[in-house]
Amino acid sequence: MIHHVTLETRREDVDDAVAFWALLGFERVEPPSERLASIAVWVQRAGTQVHLLFHDAPVAPARGHTAVVAEEYDDAVARLERAGFECRPSTQDWGSPRCSVVSPGGHRVEVMAFPPNA
């Protein structure tokens, strides 16, 4: 199990990034120390966290991405699209509906109905 992933985000984009992750079922949680809270905001769903690390010039890899399973895939895609995000369908290599969306801050996020070998 992966516990967390860290994505760089400008401080001024944090609220938008938290709102984006909320569309996928993540809730804001407090980091365990003031030091960590001064450098990042955390969101969590089912024990998995995304740490939004403050950076003046964040890097979002062109091909890199974070993938999440959305148990209610169609509902999650509808929420993202209603919020103005473009969900680009991906091939269903293992039969799972999937799409890619770009989060605030420019990170590519793959949303899937179920993972391979589920």
Predicted regions and their residues:
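Vicinal oxygen chelate
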Residues: 31, 83-118
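Mid-chain, well-packed structural core segment of small domains
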Residues: 63-85
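N-terminal beta-strand motif that seeds the catalytic metal site of vicinal oxygen chelate
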Residues: 1-18, 64-66, 117-118
